[in-house]
């Protein structure tokens, strides 16, 4: 044990050698002592190392082509949306990196403003999955919020600050890490005001929510209640800066295509105008031609649109794309169910016609890729119920008839092993 012998035995720090009279606190361990000054020094070293680790991650930011290539492994189709998202996400985190470096620079930096993303497109086409895959690749906190549950502060429903609480929870309450995360707000089209004219009456779940979202979208120091706010009014607030949080807001925007079609169709009026048939106008990708004026007419306020400068559109998935989604991505549904059956020692096979029939059903139901799993569950339910109780099945083959006519899948029996045949003959 470390001691000083002049004028009586005094305990001293095992690290710096200072006596208990020279420091404020001396903490004892098994045979060692550490003072408060050495503890502070250790904390500073740890914080510096963690900050250096964060800088390394930013330096290793993947390029747009690498981001798009990663998305290709999980999401089928939607090439335009992938390219738009890849560039927007790269620029966003490059902006954060530039902000970190400018703190150490004496020159006056050019301030880079944030570019949040608006995603348009029908349900079941991959909007949410694209955002989830991006967050997975970048290893940043990710939170999903439903805009329909939000209301203005003081009304029944969720405050917009609850969105930030979900992000903080996803970061395990590491606020610094949460401040570079991604928030995905779905169903944003449901908070559009009822008309493009400003409302005289209070619209607490529409225009009111858009107004409430403006500050956090732009970047502000927000006070977030750790337990949800309204039920616990006296709790301490968590402070979070949303300046570097990337917001991706999305919606199906049903009816927007007609607004775009009407505007695009007017180009055919007057001398020298391009004349196009109604069929040509109807068959084009309307969401790719969306302008701010269309979104205002739909019911989004100009200030809200102004904070979403990047627009990415997804299109309806055709039959060929749905078949690819079933079998090609790294975590494709077919691969997932094949693995489930492997756990029971059974091989699972889908014929090409069966996959096409599943895609046809998803198109007929209008559920897109989101409805594929439900159809697969319906098709495989009878055999998934029976297989665990049987040991005579080697293979299950799902055919077109299984999907269309509710016929049971073809079951290939397992050949008995030599020992089983010997036991049976005996």
Curated annotation (Swiss-Prot):
* GO biological process terms held by the UniProt record: cell division; proteolysis involved in protein catabolic process
Which Gene Ontology molecular-function terms are recorded? ATP binding; ATP hydrolysis activity; ATP-dependent protein folding chaperone; protein dimerization activity; unfolded protein binding; zinc ion binding
Ligand binding (ATP): 122-129
Residue runs in coiled coils: none
A Pfam family that this protein carries is zf-C4_ClpX
> Would you name any one GO CC term?
HslUV protease complex
Positions binding Zn(2+) in this chain are 13, 16, 35, 38
Among CDD domains, the record links this protein to: RecA-like_ClpX
Domain ClpX-type ZB stretches:
1-54
Top-level taxon in the UniProt lineage: Bacteria
What UniProt keywords apply to this chain's record, in alphabetical order? Answer: ATP-binding, Chaperone, Metal-binding, Nucleotide-binding, Zinc
Q: Which SUPFAM superfamilies match?
A: Glucocorticoid receptor-like (DNA-binding domain), P-loop containing nucleoside triphosphate hydrolases
What is the annotated quaternary arrangement, including any partners? Component of the ClpX-ClpP complex. Forms a hexameric ring that, in the presence of ATP, binds to fourteen ClpP subunits assembled into a disk-like structure with a central cavity, resembling the structure of eukaryotic proteasomes.
The record, for NCBIfam families, names: clpX, PRK05342.1
Q: What does this protein do?
A: ATP-dependent specificity component of the Clp protease. It directs the protease to specific substrates. Can perform chaperone functions in the absence of ClpP.
Q: Which PANTHER family match?
A: ATP-DEPENDENT CLP PROTEASE ATP-BINDING SUBUNIT CLPX-LIKE, MITOCHONDRIAL, ATP-DEPENDENT CLP PROTEASE ATP-BINDING SUBUNIT CLPX-LIKE, MITOCHONDRIAL-RELATED
The family note in this entry says: Belongs to the ClpX chaperone family.
- This one is known as ATP-dependent Clp protease ATP-binding subunit ClpX
Q: Which organism is it from?
A: Mycolicibacterium smegmatis (strain ATCC 700084 / mc(2)155)
Q: Which gene encodes it?
A: clpX
């Amino acid at each position: 044990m470390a001691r000083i012998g002049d004028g009586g035995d005094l305990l001293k720090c095992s690290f710096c050698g200072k006596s208990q009279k020279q420091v404020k606190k001396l903490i004892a361990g098994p045979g060692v002592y550490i003072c408060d000054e050495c503890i502070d020094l250790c904390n500073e070293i740890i914080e510096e190392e963690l900050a250096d680790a964060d800088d390394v991650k930013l330096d290793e930011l993947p390029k747009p082509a690498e981001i798009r290539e990663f998305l290709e492994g999980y999401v089928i189709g939607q090439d335009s949306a992938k390219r738009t998202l890849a560039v927007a996400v790269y620029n966003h985190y490059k902006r954060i990196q530039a902000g970190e470096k400018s703190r150490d620079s004496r020159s006056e930096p050019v301030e880079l403003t944030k570019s949040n993303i608006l995603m348009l497109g029908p349900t079941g086409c991959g909007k949410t999955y694209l955002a989830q895959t991006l967050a997975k690749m970048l290893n940043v906190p990710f939170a999903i919020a439903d805009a329909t549950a939000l209301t203005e502060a003081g009304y029944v429903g969720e405050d917009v600050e609850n969105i930030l609480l979900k992000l903080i929870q996803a970061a395990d309450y590491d606020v610094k890490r949460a401040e570079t995360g991604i928030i995905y707000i779905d169903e944003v089209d449901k908070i559009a005001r009822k008309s493009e004219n400003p409302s005289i009456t209070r619209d607490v779940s529409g225009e009111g929510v858009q107004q409430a979202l403006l500050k956090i979208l732009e970047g502000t120091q927000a006070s977030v209640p750790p337990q949800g706010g309204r039920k616990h009014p006296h709790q301490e607030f968590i402070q979070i800066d949303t300046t570097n949080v990337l917001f991706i807001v999305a919606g199906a925007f049903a009816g927007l295509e007609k607004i775009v079609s009407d505007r695009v169709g007017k180009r055919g009026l007057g001398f020298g105008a391009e004349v196009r048939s109604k069929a040509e106008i109807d068959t084009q990708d309307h969401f790719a031609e969306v302008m701010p004026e269309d979104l205002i007419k739909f019911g989004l306020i100009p200030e809200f649109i102004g904070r979403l400068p990047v627009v990415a559109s997804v299109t309806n998935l055709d039959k060929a794309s749905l078949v690819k989604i079933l079998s090609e991505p790294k975590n494709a549904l077919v691969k997932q169910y094949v693995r489930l059956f492997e756990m029971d020692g059974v091989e699972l096979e889908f014929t090409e016609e069966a996959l096409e029939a599943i895609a046809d059903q998803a198109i007929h139901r209008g559920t897109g890729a989101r409805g594929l799993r439900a159809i697969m569950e319906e098709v495989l339910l009878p055999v998934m119920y029976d297989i665990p109780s049987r040991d005579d099945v080697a293979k299950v083959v799902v055919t077109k008839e299984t999907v269309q006519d509710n016929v049971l899948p073809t079951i290939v029996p397992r050949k008995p092993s030599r020992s089983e045949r010997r036991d049976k003959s005996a």
